[in-house]
């Protein structure tokens, strides 16, 4: 609101995305930072995503909660270093896409504000990623599409469809809300 009022700038809020490297079956590679740019599933050989090395410093009382959060976000545990009897330094490797959305907020919430996060880019790694399309009345809605790990796709699609069901006002006709990967309906 302030940006609009003071600088006459309108803002569009979107979900944060990272840049994926999509290696196609013809040997070429394209950079994709938006699900709408994803090539058809049959043309994809493999996809790589950016990984980061994260250093999380937290009181030892919250270490278990932070470890669970990291595990839920596909974190790869590297090491633990006790800085004192009450503070621990945890090192993880994460896909960047797993921490850019709400990881920091959840980490702060789980540690009552005491944990801190620092990270740096490592490299791109091969991952089992898919494009999740949200269909309304069998028509894909590009703004709701996302690139997710296959292991999280069903749960993420179900949550998104349930949320849409709650948000879309009732109509005189039925609106079908579905999540799909390629031609396969998953939710």
What are the residue ranges of the model-derived segments?
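Accessory interaction regions appended to the cores of large information-processing enzymes
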Residues: 1-187
């Amino acid at each position: 609101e302030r940006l609009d009022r003071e600088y006459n700038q309108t803002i569009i809020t979107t979900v944060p995305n990272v840049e994926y490297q999509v290696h196609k079956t013809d040997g070429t590679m394209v950079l994709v930072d938006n699900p709408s740019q994803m090539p058809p599933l049959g043309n994809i050989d493999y996809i790589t995503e950016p990984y980061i090395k994260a250093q999380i410093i937290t009181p030892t009382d919250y270490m278990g909660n932070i470890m669970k959060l990291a595990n839920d976000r596909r974190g790869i545990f590297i090491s633990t270093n006790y800085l004192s009897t009450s503070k621990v330094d945890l090192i993880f490797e994460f896909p960047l896409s797993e921490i850019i959305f709400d990881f920091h907020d959840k980490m702060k919430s789980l540690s009552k504000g005491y944990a801190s996060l620092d990270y740096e880019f490592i490299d791109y790694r091969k991952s089992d990623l898919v494009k999740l399309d949200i269909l309304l009345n069998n028509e894909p809605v590009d703004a709701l599409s996302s690139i997710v790990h296959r292991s999280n796709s069903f749960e993420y699609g179900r949550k998104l469809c349930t949320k849409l069901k709650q948000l879309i006002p009732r109509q005189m006709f039925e609106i079908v809300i579905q999540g799909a990967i390629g031609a396969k309906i998953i939710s």
